[in-house]
Regions:
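Bacterial N-terminal signal peptides
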Residues: 9-18
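Alpha-helical, coiled-coil/dimerization segments enriched in small aliphatic residues
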Residues: 218-245
Length: 255
């Protein structure tokens, strides 16, 4: 009997040590320290603008147990402002998204995560793009699972925030090689485009418009430091704006 008790105690101690060893603290993209168990997650929910897109680059969509309504094209009642915009991750995986539970409405007009809807999906981790530390901490407390915040940054896939988000996801889901491959591929493509366009002398002046800013916009929404133009050595006609990033200009300036 004593031997059995000793064996049982040793087994429990071993299991506890294994779980402890598997856990690690990571720092998400808004500086929050979160304890995770890398490679252990089987049920994933992505919330907030950009979270599902970034996860789709690197994570398995088969692990998703819920999506926000904006990404479920089978729903009649949902935000539709991006239906006319090409969203590669929806084109690639949209049929799978339609089979998943609702994790909330989503979209640019939703500023708070819907905890009850997320709980109904029963995730063991949440990937978020809501960049409010207090709200993210509160949501994590409500859900009882890690809530990891990503950031894409103003320059999209060419942004340091995007690259670091890929590295973070790679660590959490134990796909570090894939994260490195994605970042390396994007950097190589940017370098190749720069190389091909560097010696172009006859450059037409170009205006970019309709840039997203918490939803769809019009011809007056532009940027003077549009990253794709910078990489491709394009002559951007927009100059002299007070700040960087996507912003509206006056009709007079457009004309």
């Amino acid at each position: 009997m004593k031997i059995r008790k000793i064996v049982a105690m040793l087994t429990m101690a071993f299991l506890a040590t294994s779980v402890f060893a598997a856990s690690k603290k990571i720092t998400d993209m808004i500086g929050r320290e979160v304890t995770v168990n890398p490679g252990s997650y089987k049920r994933v929910v992505c919330i907030g603008a950009g979270a599902l897109r970034m996860y789709s680059y690197i994570g398995s969509v088969d692990l998703l147990c819920g999506v926000e309504d904006i990404d479920n094209t089978s729903l009649k009642q949902r935000p539709k402002m991006f239906d006319s915009v090409a969203r590669p991750y929806v084109i690639a995986y949209g049929d799978k998204f339609t089979k998943l539970e609702s994790a909330g409405v989503g979209g640019p007009n939703t500023q708070t995560a819907e905890a009850e809807k997320i709980l109904m999906c029963n995730p063991d981790i949440v990937i978020s793009e809501y960049e409010d530390k207090e709200k993210e901490d509160a949501l994590q407390e409500q859900l009882g699972v890690p809530v990891i915040t990503l950031k894409s940054g103003p320059n999209g896939v060419f942004d340091d925030n995007f690259r670091n988000s890929m590295i973070l996801l790679g660590d959490i889901f134990k796909v570090q090689k894939k994260a490195k491959k994605i970042n390396k591929c994007i950097a190589a493509q940017a370098k190749e485009i720069q190389k091909r366009t560097a010696k172009v002398t006859d450059k037409p002046k170009v205006y970019i418009c309709g840039l997203g800013n918490w939803g769809t916009t019009n011809h007056l929404m532009t940027a003077q430091n549009y990253i794709s133009f910078d990489i491709a050595n394009v002559d951007n006609v927009v100059t002299g704006l007070a700040k960087k990033g996507n912003q509206p200009i006056e009709k007079e300036k457009f004309v």
